Amino acid sequence: MADPAVDVQKEDFYQDMTCAPIFGHILNYSHMLKLQAVHHIAIICSDYPKSKQFYTEILGFNIDREVFRDARDSYKLDLSLNGQYIIELFSFPSPPARVSRPEACGLRHIAFQVDNVEEAIADLNAKDIYPEPVRIDEFTGKKFTFFADPDDLPIELYEI
């Protein structure tokens, strides 16, 4: 018996572009979630003091709240940028290393917009961080570069 929630004929799909095939089903976009924005990104680090220093002193995030959770033997650090809550930084005892290369499924990188990529690179170089050479986005023509956080999470700087 067909599932009425996904019972859309192929002909209907091509006539009504509010539908798209997802996970082997055809879903009606009129019933999709109405997400508003990314609320925050949670990052687990292997060396809490080093990552805290990186995200605050190198990248310029502000500390909104920091707590040690005894039951989890873990720190939780809430970080904001320009008044917007963005990152939860967690420490856990002996977390497994993140696989960055070869690229694996899951989070690929996080990207931050900057006014000037070359100025951002100069600031990072002054702090002994050396991003990849600047590239140009083939679609937008904008400049971008990558470097890594202390646990090799790729971070992109994208010029707006």
Name every feature range the model reports, one short phrase each.
Residues 37, 73-75, 106, 141:
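Exposed loop/turn and edge beta-strand positions of beta-sandwich/beta-sheet ligand-binding modules
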Residues 19, 26-34, 67, 78, ...:
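Vicinal oxygen chelate
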Residues 64-66, 72-74, 94-100, 133:
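A short, acidic/glycine-rich surface segment
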Residues 26-49, 107-110:
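N-terminal beta-strand motif that seeds the catalytic metal site of vicinal oxygen chelate
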Residues 44-86:
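Core segments of cupin and vicinal oxygen chelate
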Residues 1-31:
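N-terminal amphipathic/basic-hydrophobic helices that include classical n-h-c signal peptides
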